[in-house]
């Protein structure tokens, strides 16, 4: 995620006192942004990546949904992961309250968007990274949207109910 997009999420996070943040798909933005939240929960499918990010993002709670697929070589791991429904990963938030900020930047983004709608706090914001991918768009219908585009054309959609 580019700095301009991280800056937009940071601005939203800083506008709420002690926000509760949910992030599907962790990474460098988790490390940077989790310092600014009251509670930060990151959901991940790669145990190797979850461990690496957790070491750097001490303010975040990282929950890994290990699918039991060997992570090396990486391209085979990614191909196998695409075939799985990842229901626990997608549905985890349903039983865990509401969130002020939700970042969708991992696997199964369209399905995660559907869940995000149901667990978004009143006045909350959903961010969808790489929103230029048309197969995510149906999951965003009916939400208010602001589009942020970085210098490479990647889109971050900022949405609310």
Predicted regions and their residues:
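C-terminal substrate-binding/active-site "lid" region of AdoMet-derived donor-dependent transferases
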Residues: 92-96, 101, 107-161
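Internal catalytic-core helix/loop-beta-alpha segment
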Residues: 63-115
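SAM cofactor-binding core of SAM-dependent methyltransferases
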Residues: 2-74
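Generic detector of well-ordered alpha-helical packing
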Residues: 24, 45, 106, 130-131
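Short, surface-exposed linear patches
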Residues: 43-46, 64, 84-85, 124-128, ...
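Short, charged, surface-exposed secondary-structure boundary motifs
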Residues: 49-57, 71-75, 135-140, 154-160
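Generic enzyme active-site microenvironment
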Residues: 21, 42, 103, 127-128
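Exposed alpha-helical structural elements
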Residues: 8-11, 88, 139
